[in-house]
UniProtKB/Swiss-Prot annotation:
Protein's name in the database: Cyclic AMP-responsive element-binding protein 3-like protein 3
GO terms classed as biological process: positive regulation of transcription by RNA polymerase II; response to endoplasmic reticulum stress; response to unfolded protein
Principal subcellular localization: endoplasmic reticulum
Transmembrane segments: 318-338
Keywords: Activator, DNA-binding, Endoplasmic reticulum, Glycoprotein, Isopeptide bond, Membrane, Nucleus, Signal-anchor, Transcription, Transcription regulation, Transmembrane, Transmembrane helix, Ubl conjugation, Unfolded protein response
Annotated region described as Leucine-zipper, given as residue ranges: 281-302
Tissue and organ distribution: Expressed in adult liver (at protein level) and small intestine.
Superkingdom of origin: Eukaryota
Molecular function in Gene Ontology: DNA-binding transcription activator activity, RNA polymerase II-specific; protein heterodimerization activity; protein homodimerization activity; RNA polymerase II transcription regulatory region sequence-specific DNA binding
Topology term for the membrane: Single-pass type II membrane protein
Induction / repression: By IL6. Pro-inflammatory cytokines and lipopolysaccharide activate the UPR and induce cleavage of CREBH in the liver. Down-regulated in the liver during fasting-refeeding. This down-regulation may occur at the postranscriptional level and may be mediated by SYNV1/HRD1, which induces CREB3L3 ubiquitination and proteasomal degradation.
Amino acid sequence: MDGDIAAGKMASPVCAMAPLDSMEVLDLLFDRQDGILRNVELAEGWILAREEQKVLLNSDSDEFLNCILGPGDSDPSSPLWSPADSDSGISEDLPSDPQDTPPRSGTEPANTVARCHTREQGKGPCPSYLPSTPCPEPPRTQVQESSVAIDLDMWSTDTLYPEEPAGSPSRFNLTVKELLLSGGSGDLQQHSLAASQLLGPGSGHCQELVLTEDEKKLLAKEGVTLPTQLPLTKYEERVLKKIRRKIRNKQSAQESRKKKKEYIDGLENRMSACTAQNQELQRKVLHLEKQNLSLLEQLKHLQALVVQSTSKPAHAGTCIAVLLLSFALIILPSISPFNSNKVDSPGDFVPVRVFSRTLHNHAASRVAPDVTPGSEVPGPWPDVGTPHKGPSSGGLSADWGNFLEIPMLDNLTEELDNSTLVLANSTEDLGRATLLDWVASEPLLSPGRVGLEIPGEMWLSWVPRWLRVRLVQDALGVL
């Protein structure tokens, strides 16, 4: 009952106070009027130690206080704090500033005092001031270490811990409670009851433990029941940590399976698309192969036709016919075998009047005498190279001899030669009978007419006989 009263007194001041000094903590704990531990019964050895402390010298007193208040002399295996390698949440956090945890500084000296008087003489860190009587151990109860440690890292601050005000109590208030209850009964159930009273709804400092459905299911499956209020014991923390680890592993496995399923579905879709595309390409390849085979067959057929056409030899008769045709096309225009038939028809031939300028002038200046037909006597053939020396018998022959003896004989001869060439060219197409008719003597001039007028039928009658004969011979030679 005394422990409950002390716990009720220290709930609000200790949690709300600022970081205190060691002496203030001692005064707060051991003051006879207002101290928290004034009603707690101490062991007999502890009372004797306090009486002896009054009579000690200042040096012994300082040594005793250093033994009590020295942080380095405290037992590292204290059951009130979790070791650094434990699974609790306190061990995972970085060591905090001593000013942030004032209750611990108040509990360490008390524990140290309790331990100093339980050791034998000459063996403990504190010397015994009663040489014959050892310090008896004060009655205390073994408290589980897990009643202090709280894993804050494993619990989400959004779901488990609401935002605390500036004056919220520290999580180490439980150690002060244990210190207060250390002199009381040793039943663990009383400690749990005191903790529930300390963090109950009436105190205003309790924090509820919020569990998800999965956590509740796994806890029920494990057969563990967790309290709804904080803090938890170390065993409960380990169980909760294990449950949450399982939940995280389950969630990660579900996400992994989901991603794997999505990846496999994507691969299957791609595989189906690739399979359809592959089938389409195979159909196209088969179609192209068929077209290629048909084209190859057509090419072979064309090659066979070309080989057959080139292997046939050229016939000799065809070559001879081509040569004869070409020769005939070259030779036939110069032969003209149809000229006689053309000359026989009188309508096909049109006489052409050919005049010599010199002969025309001389003939125009003279008046031909009347000549009767048949009066011309044929004389000897005149020699072209020798001039005539005298007149020949017959008027026409004499006239032609005098004409040939004029000084312009050379020019006349050249003109006659030119006329002969023209006449020769014009008489190539005449027949032999026509040329023989020209050789016969005919009068050059009609009786009673002046000048040379050649009738249309006999356009060459003005040419001398010997010249006509020569022209006829030349024409016959060509034929």
